[in-house]
Amino acid sequence: MDYENFVKSAEEINNLHNVNYLETKDLNDFNWKAAYYICKEIYDKQQINKDGYVVIGLSGGRTPIDVYKNMCLIKDIKIDKSKLIFFIIDERYKSDDHKFSNYNNIKFLFHNLNINEKEQLYKPDTTKSIVDCILDYNDKIKIMIEKYKKVDIAILGMGSDFHIASLFPNIFYNIYMNNYQNNYIYNEKTLDFINNDQDNDNLKYLKEYVYFTTTNQFDVRKRITVSLNLLANASSKIFLLNSKDKLDLWKNMLIKSYIEVNYNLYPATYLIDTSCTNENVNINNNNNNNNKNKNNYCYSNTTVISCGYENYTKSIEEIYDSKYALSLYSNSLNKEELLTIIIFGCSGDLAKKKIYPALFKLFCNNSLPKDLLIIGFARTVQDFDTFFDKIVIYLKRCLLCYEDWSISKKKDLLNGFKNRCRYFVGNYSSSESFENFNKYLTTIEEEEAKKKYYATCYKMNGSDYNISNNVAEDNISIDDENKTNEYFQMCTPKNCPDNVFSSNYNFPYVINRMLYLALPPHIFVSTLKNYKKNCLNSKGTDKILLEKPFGNDLDSFKMLSKQILENFNEQQIYRIDHYLGKDMVSGLLKLKFTNTFLLSLMNRHFIKCIKITLKETKGVYGRGQYFDPYGIIRDVMQNHMLQLLTLITMEDPIDLNDESVKNEKIKILKSIPSIKLEDTIIGQYEKAENFKEDENNDDESKKNHSYHDDPHIDKNSITPTFCTCILYINSINWYGVPIIFKSGKGLNKDICEIRIQFHNIMGSSDENMNNNEFVIILQPVEAIYLKMMIKKTGCEEMEEVQLNLTVNEKNKKINVPEAYETLLLECFKGHKKKFISDEELYESWRIFTPLLKELQEKQVKPLKYSFGSSGPKEVFGLVKKYYNYGKNYTHRPEFVRKSSFYEDDLLDIN
């Protein structure tokens, strides 16, 4: 490339919302255009700067290296190299000759440009202690600014956590902890910050030029970086983004910052918001309201040079141009948003016992938008009051955890929630039914939008009244004549937006929908097809929540998945495994990756085996029609237990965002071979001979019975209600470590636990030495404890003790979010980490389908075990090959936290 070709391509630079975008075709094109762009910026600034000096900040990383190499080769832009002043934007705290040193990786640039480093380069002296290094470099940068008055050019990139330079989110917290706390580097008294490390205003108190920061994501933890304010004041800020991943990050940053920007988390947005200057102003005097002309009112000094996508700026423009872009992309609460939650199968037990109570608690906690509709769709013919009377008993149970609230407040909340609920009778397979549903749906959504519209106009006249602010007044209808007239009196053309009463005026109101399919999977496709054909949302997004089971083997899953994805894309699908919504389960990742002792020991060198147990005292009486076609393996092993395994064995992800966690889970699943029949024992419970009944128990499924007592189960059914199997993970970390799955119905206790058993000390001759064990109990209580050996007091014998690591009274929470409460909120926010991806399900079925087929083809009969026992006796021999039972282990911590406010049973999906 030569200068003339670059100038032609530069004519295609687009400006969108204070950012210039220069697109390139490939990496070679990127490296040349970026080099020419930087050289052109240097040349232009030498022409206008006093004495021709240009101050340039260089950031590290791999991306700019090839760009800098090309800069050395450019001859057709004449630059006075003797007047170039460079400084290192960020540096790793390593010696200058270290392979990770930013200076070491770019020093060729100074050599090729004949830069006198003593006179023309400012860099940190990493031979000093970190404190002295920071203070010394801070003084150097201060001298540089005093001498040259400003920074002309800052060349930057962006990391996977949105960091720029070495300013790692949360910026204020990172800088404060590493620099000011206990006066480590700078005087803490100079800060008078707001007591909220997320607040943008805190950044203005960071007035030094150079800071010490730390990161756990990269090889070199200790970093030296110039301040965000110094970079923001650069006359030209150039971002080099040379891959799809980096461009996705940039777009994601813009999306997340659309409503309410957080500079502490997205520092590049701070540079954008300070990028509009009066330099080279080219004011467009016409009154065209076109978006591009709007943004040309000032000179933008932030430039993104991109590579990886064609028409990247078009995709960026869509964020701003779409009427509904705000809600389509943003995870933040939108004050202009109506959220409609549609529950298909609302008359079933899942909806009554789980979904509606979870929504009610979110409503009570103000976690959902004030503008909210909840519409139940079912085949059962009944009026709304009859339907609501069936769910209100479960809603009232939720209020038990709000002990401090008055009875009147609780009544108001129930009434307010009821006024947001609706009921529609329809048929899932009838297109006509969905046509009628669409008319009903759009009518009530428009009514809610009008409420918001009138309330908005009311505010324009100086009133702060909002029709949805008071729960007790939520029964107000827009058809209320007096209230409507009052609104129209306030909404005069004088006080409302231009053309507000015009027939083509479109009120900027977003309607987002969450569709919960609390249905059997064979109804999924017809429901989604009819909804897409007749009811598709044109004013916002549709998010689809699906309940298990997702097929009954690999082939049926592939077919179901194909049909679902023909109607809605993967980004819209939220597949629920309710175990991922449990509070302790969601804490497994942080438990592992924030505790050094656990992270360093979680591999085959230290771990003897992992045992995951999920036992229930309930049988399946009353639910046999659902359970019998699936059995225990499909019910809990292929989903819940496998998900728990991925969370405790996955590698440390790059970060904890949705995609990174999903990728690491998939790596584990891909490493698990199919389960062998010889490593499996199945069982089926029968009526016990000496079972002691609980006189207070009214639950038929907990009373002594045989599996075949359920009237919906064939007397010859061989469906297993119990299974123990051995899995392996063929990865470097876990090769050869047996994973024991054990689960069943009608057993001796209710528990879900993970036991990580360690190898014994090599060479130990003490046969009584029990293995150390790290135990995590997920339900019916939450507990963590460690089994270890100590010497008995007064003798030489060893004994086993338990170190209680359970949450203490100080952190005790009476109101722990229930799984569905968490999952519904995560879906609303657009977070997918706690949901199962299509690829995860594919691998899950791949692991279990061969075993399921072999059991069916060979008609393997399950071993019998008594109701209320621990399962088939033969299981002990299989497990003992891999797991050291040791002494009876019945210890429980003194304080444990209930894992769920509700009973945890999902088998009866209607």
From Swiss-Prot:
Pathway: Carbohydrate degradation; pentose phosphate pathway; D-ribulose 5-phosphate from D-glucose 6-phosphate (oxidative stage): step 1/3; Carbohydrate degradation; pentose phosphate pathway; D-ribulose 5-phosphate from D-glucose 6-phosphate (oxidative stage): step 2/3. Optimum pH is 8.0 for G6PD activity. Coiled coil: none annotated. Residues 277-910 are annotated as: Glucose-6-phosphate 1-dehydrogenase. Residues 1-170 are annotated as: 6-phosphogluconolactonase. It comes from the Eukaryota. Its EC number is 3.1.1.31, 1.1.1.49. D-glucose 6-phosphate binds at K548, H578, Y579, L580, G581, K582, E616, D635, K745, Q779. NADP(+) 2 binds at K742, R755, Y785, L786, K787. It holds the Pfam family G6PD_C. Bifunctional enzyme which catalyzes the first two steps of the oxidative pentose-phosphate pathway, which represents a route for the dissimilation of carbohydrates besides glycolysis. The main function of this enzyme is to provide reducing power (NADPH) and pentose phosphates for fatty acid and nucleic acid synthesis. In the N-terminal section; belongs to the glucosamine/galactosamine-6-phosphate isomerase family. 6-phosphogluconolactonase subfamily. This is Bifunctional glucose-6-phosphate 1-dehydrogenase/6-phosphogluconolactonase. It comes from Plasmodium falciparum (isolate 3D7).
